[in-house]
C-alpha cells in the first residue's frame, strides 16, 4: 500500500480510537482478521467492534463499522465481493470506502429500509456517535 493509503487509514483509526475508548469499543487496523461466518476472512483497513470481547484471539466477527481505503489493485474487490460480504453482517452499521485519489467517501449506511449508498465529504458512524470528515481522513 502507498504512503497515502497508510496515512489515511491511520488518520481514520486514530479518530475512531478517540471515540471508541470511552464506549468500550475496539478499533483495529489491517492486521486483524474479520471472519464472516465460515465463508470468508478479510483484513479491513480499519474496523470498529463494540460489545463483548473477541470470540477468538485472532479474529473478530461483529464489527459495527468497516473502512477500506481504495487502491487500484483492490478497488474492484472492495466495491463488489467485500461489500456483499460486509453488508451481510447483522452487526454492521456502516461500510466506508475512501478514495484517496479523488478524496471522497462512499458510505453504505444501514437504515430501517436496509443499506443506502451515499457519497460525500462526511459520514456518520453511529456506534461511535461520530461524524468522520474528509478533513479527518486526509490530515497531514
Segments and roles (model prediction):
Residues 1-140:
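Gly/Pro/Ser/Thr-rich low-complexity, intrinsically disordered segments predominantly at protein N-termini
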Amino acid at each position: 500500500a502507498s504512503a497515502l493509503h497508510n496515512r489515511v487509514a491511520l488518520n481514520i483509526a486514530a479518530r475512531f480510537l478517540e471515540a471508541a475508548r470511552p464506549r468500550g469499543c475496539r478499533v483495529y487496523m489491517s492486521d486483524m482478521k474479520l471472519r464472516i461466518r465460515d465463508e470468508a476472512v478479510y483484513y479491513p483497513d480499519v474496523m470498529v467492534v463494540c460489545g463483548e470481547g473477541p470470540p477468538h484471539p485472532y479474529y473478530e466477527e461483529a464489527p459495527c463499522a468497516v473502512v477500506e481505503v481504495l487502491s487500484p489493485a483492490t478497488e474492484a474487490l472492495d466495491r463488489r465481493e467485500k461489500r456483499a460480504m460486509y453488508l451481510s453482517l447483522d452487526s454492521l452499521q456502516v461500510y466506508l470506502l475512501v478514495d484517496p485519489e479523488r478524496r471522497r467517501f462512499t458510505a453504505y449506511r444501514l437504515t430501517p429500509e436496509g443499506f443506502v449508498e451515499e457519497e460525500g465529504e462526511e459520514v456518520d458512524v453511529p456506534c461511535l456517535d461520530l461524524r468522520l470528515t474528509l478533513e479527518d481522513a486526509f490530515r497531514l
